[in-house]
Amino acid sequence: MKTFTVIGLGRFGTSVATQLFNMGYEVLAIDKNMDKINAIANLVTRAACTDAKDESLLKQLGVKNSDCAIVCIGGDDITDSVLTTLALKDMGVKQVVCKAKDNMHKTVLKKVGADNVIIPEQEAGVKAAIELVSDRLFDIIELSDEYSIVDAVVPNTWIGKSIMELSVRKKYNVNIVAIKSNN
């Protein structure tokens, strides 16, 4: 079973931790605020109140054995999230995903070794704007800065033509991974 460690239990971290647990994964939730630990204790596999910047404490909790650690530490001071990310990478955690507050924070997290960095407010804003102006897009899943999966209605001019005829890869740099029809 895949194991996750979620560090920082604000709205985003709590949502990630509980969703992963509800999907059947093993989740260790960490925060330095005991009230947040008490609130989530029955909603995840384990919960611990500790300073995530301290590598020795993380090792005692077995964080090193997690398949993925998600750093969701918020606030204006990026120091805690950067130092926590560094500690996780130094310990050898396989995958470290971080929440950033802005592009500068994202750049710093990438430089200290984060495997993936998301900016939830930015991603939600982009998705909302696209959905508001397009009646042809149903869903967008950002996989990385360069790749997304998009569920969309094709233009009428594409109907009845083969993928080869359309040359979508050449013209639009798009790979079609699935086709859903009304039939």
Sequence positions of predicted segments:
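Cytosolic Rossmann-like ligand/nucleotide-binding regulatory domains
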Residues: I7, I30, W158-N183
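Conserved beta-strand segments of the P-loop GTPase G domain that flank and frequently precede/overlap
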Residues: V71-C72, V153, I179
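Short amphipathic beta-strand starts and helix->beta connectors
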Residues: V133-L137, S181-N183
